Amino acid sequence: MPGVKGLKVLRPGLHLGTLKKNRFEPTHALALALGANLLPGDELLSPVGAPYDTLEEVIGIRPSPGSLREYGVSYRQVDLLPDGSFDYDGIRAAIHEKTKLVTIQRSKGYATRPSFSAEEIGKLIAFCKNCKPDIICMVDNCYGELVERQEPTDVGADMVVGSLIKNLGGGLAPTGGYVCGRQDLIDRCAYRLSAPGLGKEVGANLGLLTSFYQGLFLAPTVVASSVKGAIFTAGCYEALGFRVVPGSREVRRDIIQAVELGSREAMCAFCKGIQAAAPVDSYVTPEPWAMPGYDSDVIMAAGAFVQGSSIELSADGPIREPYAVYFQGGLTWYHAKLGILMSLQKMVEAGLVNL
């Protein structure tokens, strides 16, 4: 395929792995990569603190049938230091002979820590490999693709996992996730996905490859619009006195903008504004609910053409302190701007801010 060959020219060390076309989202891709490369008796280490909520059941932090823990894979984590930097002493102490794989979540998820740059990730990978040369370093690259000049595979990552209904799909990919990196690791993922001995040699493409490649072609422009929208969001809410992560003048590492709103009511008003600006289901009123995979109610605003797409205008967050909402996406800068202005209008109507 010319498209795949072109990617390999751009990223010479990159082995394009599983590109799953069914209803496949990043948690599935991460579970696949972990399950394929961890065996009973191995240990998984997170040197960046707790994983994203939906991975807790995959790992077994919260009990769930089929988790890694159920299959004899242990887990430990090293929390970040109070300033958000890596605890290198703690990481060194945590790595031992059973530590098989290190998982690095680039984006903040539902936390208010800064997201990590490719350069920071590269330094962490080098440190981990200095402690144990054969350790596998995997990066959850969701929301970070194309935001910086470098990607995790440029700075030593053995395996990178992400979603096609986020940055790389450019808003056109209707579904899909990806795993890429070192050939032997990707082969194991392919065997896990289909069957040993079959790997990537089987599977229907369902006529979706054109959408994937066209989305990838447009992705740099779409991601740029999304980043611009995030900066605008930070500037607006920063000026109103809310804490925003990152700040409006900080360097961007991903497309997510966190805004600490301080109350359930403010989160709901914000999300109602985003939903009202949506091209699909703008008449719907988002409400918090017990979403599978989360330990608290979650509110989501996403009137998107592709269900679950977070490169399209969207906002969400768990209903818990510090009541932070996470804004991302916008296929065009103008739509992102409209969404934020609508969120401000709903906040004003609810008597939560004064302009």
Go through each PLM region and give its residues:
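Conserved N-terminal alpha-helix of the aminotransferase class I/II PLP-enzyme fold
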Residues: M1-A29
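Generic structural signal for hydrophobic residues
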Residues: P2-G6, L124, T233, F270
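Broad structural signal for hydrophobic residues in well-ordered alpha-helices, predominantly aliphatic
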Residues: G6, L10, A33-L34, C128, ...
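Short glycine-rich or small-residue beta-strand-to-loop segments that form or flank ligand, phosphate
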Residues: G17-R23, A219, I255-E260
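Conserved PLP-enzyme active-site core in the AAT-like
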Residues: F24-A224, K228-G229, A234-Y237, G241-V245, ...
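Conserved C-terminal alpha-helix-loop-beta "cap" of PLP-dependent enzymes
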Residues: E238-L355
